[in-house]
Amino acid sequence: MAFPVDLLDNCTHEELENSSEDYLSSLRCGDPEHPECFSSLNITIPVSLSNVGFVPLYGGNQTQKILALFAPEDSLTAVALYLVGQWWAIDDIVKTSEPSREGLKQVSTLGERVVLYVLNRIIYRKQEMERNEIPFLCHSSTDYAKILWKKGEAVGFYSVKPTGSLCASFLTQNYQLPVLDTMFIRKKYRGKDLGLHMLEDFVDSFTEDALGLRYPLSSLMYTASKQYFEKYPGDHELLWEVEGVGHWHQRVPVTRALQREAIKATDVSQYEATRPVSGEYGLAAVPEHEPGLDDTQSSELQIHSLKDAFASTSEGPEKTPVSTRTRSSHLKRPKIGKHFQDSEFSSSQGEDENVAKTSPTASVNKIEYAARTSESSEEFLEEEPEQGVIDFEDESGDKDAQPALETQPRLQKQDGDKDSALEPVNGEVMDAALKPSLTTEDEDSTSEGLEEDLKVPPFNSSGEPGNPVPLVAESSKVPEATLAKTSPDTDSEMLIDQSPSDDKGHTEENLSPVSKKKTLLGSSDNVATVSNIEKSDGNFPNSVVPEFPEEPVSQNLSPNTTSSVEDQGEEGAPEAQEPSATQSSLIEVELEDAPFPQNAGQKSQSEEQSEASSEHLEQFTQSAEKAVDSSSEEIEVEVPVVDRRNLRRKAKGHKGPGKKKAKLT
């Protein structure tokens, strides 16, 4: 029986394609209810237009095609080819009836090209290719190839890219040496040294000094090369593993490639030996890792470190290494209007001063405690109004002297003098302070009045007088010295008190420290005296003055703003002695708006402001007398002694231009 390879010896591509076109035309005209069937290996496949088509014989070249029949379940695998006027099964196409076709025969006829196509494209790629192998491309019509025939059947092939042939990967480059491109042997014929036979035929077919094998080496090429070098050890420099077209930088000796593959095979065998068998997990290859206990310990340490890393990310913000400055509550600015319960104000005074330096509005909240204290003691307003005014007068004098005492070395000498009472001395001072005829004094008498007023001994908590010092002769000078310090405050506070009358009740409750000052200015004569003294005392250097510019206070300021004015005084003397809770708020009032050295224009301006503000004093005098007695019995003051000589010397050294002495009638 003749097979297609035998029948196609004298056939051309055109004749084969024309016969295929004629059959396809007859198939279109056939009866669809009674189709032709093809039987192979006990399988019957109906032939119809839906499962037949042309396939290229040389891969990318679409000019030479053959008609193929596909299985219904696999439309990409041909089960038969239409050759010589009939359908031929794949197994029949690779057979021959010619006894002369034995061994390796070079492909030359159309039938042999069809056999090469079937071996490469159908048998190898669809049936026998391994997973780790790379499929071969379809051979062209001019490729050098040989088919291995064995007992009337094609069992394998190999193909070569001769020197000078065009490289498919590099379209403009040609091969520099003959390269063994493909090699294939069917599985049922492997193990009979057929690969070695093909390699020996390749070496004998080309006479070049260097021959190449396609990179990467297939398993068949690797086995054949190994057998070849065992049989011919002198040809180590003949065979090269070639990549690309085979330049010198693209070739490696096959012996080195064999060593590389041997190392890979050893690693794979060790892995296979150590890999647990199915059903016996955890029992394989444990003793091999026991000698190196350090490896297991290091792996455990890595696991623990990973656990710690994951735990640190889930424990919370307290262990997070990021800065929490913006989250800390003590660094946030308190909002205006928020009330702090400063029951222990003296213990937290240092912290409040630091916050007040960076945020002046934060001091508003600290004075509200004193305001609420004055509200709680409203019941004492009608009982001792005059005595409350006297208390505030001595307190203001005390507070004027206190910042100056920070630079005096005699501060420790006053610890034992705390036995005098406040009431009898203040009564005498009040009698003199309320006299309507106050005369202006020169700058020397003003400083003398201040110094002699500071000699009042401190009072103890029991309220009993120790060694009272009579101040009757100097009663007219005490309010002058006191008002000289507080005249800038008084001017600004007169503007505060010009708020609408509906807020008057609220002002009387919350601004008791301010009202205490207003009672000292009983008439316009007092204001004139204050303005003159203010000019002389404007350059007084011994008082600790915070660097805040004087600004006019608006008439609509709230009581909280007045409290902030009082609070800023505390910032000017952060190193002063720590007062009690009720005294600290009053100290802040005296130090806040102490003026800078004034020129002539500024002094005249302040004098005009004091004269304008005196018009509003009388209408608030009665309300102030009711509010001045807030916490009069609760306030305990210390009046430390200031060095008189230093105060007088500094006061005289900073005198302004001379003023005419005038009596105000």
Swiss-Prot record:
- Acidic residues bias spans: 376-397, 440-451
- Skewed-composition ranges (Basic and acidic residues): 412-421
Residue ranges annotated as transmembrane are none
Topology term for the membrane: Peripheral membrane protein
Mainly resides where? nucleus
The record's keywords, sorted A to Z, are: Membrane, Nucleus, Phosphoprotein
**UniProt modified residues of type Phosphoserine:** S348, S377, S447, S512, S610, S613, S630
Report biased composition (Basic residues) as residue ranges. 327-338, 646-665
Places the protein is found: Nucleus envelope; Nucleus inner membrane
Ranges of biased composition (kind: Polar residues): 311-326, 521-533, 553-566
Query: What cellular component terms from Gene Ontology apply here?
Result: nuclear inner membrane
Q: Superkingdom, according to UniProt?
A: Eukaryota
Which family does the record assign? Belongs to the FAM169 family.
- Protein's UniProt name: Soluble lamin-associated protein of 75 kDa
From which lineage does this chain's organism come? Eukaryota, Metazoa, Chordata, Craniata, Vertebrata
Gene name of the record: Fam169a
